[in-house]
Design a protein with these regions (language model features):
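N-terminal beta-strand/alpha-helix entry module and adjacent surface
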Residues: 1-91, 114-130, 141-151
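Short beta-strands and strand-loop turn motifs
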Residues: 96-102
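Beta-strand-loop-alpha "switch" segments that mediate conformational coupling across diverse proteins
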Residues: 133
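Nucleic-acid nuclease catalytic cores
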Residues: 136-138
């Protein structure tokens, strides 16, 4: 029988040191701003690889933390719903916003992006934590699954 220590199941979440409500992330524009101001400043951020982040939101849609849920290659990144929602459950989040970049600079979603968005939305419905949006960030543009009517 394998024994697991408490640290085995540790979830690493970057808690924000800001006053709750000081930043609201309720549309694609504010989500893209969050990516540019917070995520690209992280020491682990690499613009040459697809990176996927889950942003946990409170009931006022203000970020309370974020966590890196996937690091990929130049053109793909594997993300699993359990990794996205593990942090959301740990932080008692009301909703989750998923954001990832396309190093190519294009923000159009791939078929894999569409599939994971549907899986994340389904998982969120089951555990009653909203998937607010899935945003793909390109060089000068972004694609919002919510604004496209998919969510």
């Amino acid at each position: 029988m394998t024994r697991y220590g408490k640290s085995t199941f540790e979830v690493r979440v970057q808690r924000l040191n800001e006053t709750p409500g000081s930043m609201k992330v309720d549309d694609a524009s504010s989500a893209a701003t969050y990516w540019r101001e917070k995520i690209t400043a992280m020491p682990w951020y690499d613009p040459e690889r697809e990176m996927c982040v889950a942003v946990m939101l409170n009931t006022r849609l203000s970020p309370v933390g974020h966590t890196l849920v996937g690091i990929g290659t130049l053109n793909e990144c594997t993300v699993h719903p359990r990794d996205v929602f593990r942090a959301a459950v740990a932080m008692a989040a009301y909703a989750v916003l998923v954001i990832h970049n396309h190093p190519s600079g294009e923000s159009l979603p791939s078929e894999a992006d569409r599939r994971i968005t549907q899986r994340l939305a389904e998982a969120g419905r089951i555990i009653q934590i909203n998937l607010l949006d899935h945003l793909i960030v390109g060089t000068n543009t972004c694609f919002s699954f919510r604004e496209a009517g998919v969510l």
